[in-house]
């Protein structure tokens, strides 16, 4: 099996919906979601090179669960790689999303490692100010920054929606380059 030095993942987290009004805007109304146990059961660690960086998108209500996922996949948390401050699709105003207590307008991408992956650049910025596109689609700028930060190494995007040049992909919205089945 091919091993990767960069794994970029945006799991389809399942959220508790507290009202009928929120149900229409929830992740479940846009794409199939996965339970935390199902996400943890994916054999992502088997894809990882001895020295590998994991970039894991999460929303703030999933912080605790993200640590469980990183542990299950064999990675150790290092830092927040990116903070995406969302702008409205057609203006530079800040986007107002859903939220359990406050209205969310940011997502974070955690950086975790296995071994000692090599950082190629020291000037990659953390904050990404970018417009929202379709539900849960992450800004292309994040992928570009990962490429600069980590260099031209074997890399894969899990739960991918597109097939960018230089990346292997896996997901239900793309022609996957690998097979990835749950561990038994």
Over which residues does each language-model region extend?
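Class I S-adenosyl-L-methionine-dependent methyltransferase catalytic core
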Residues: 1-184
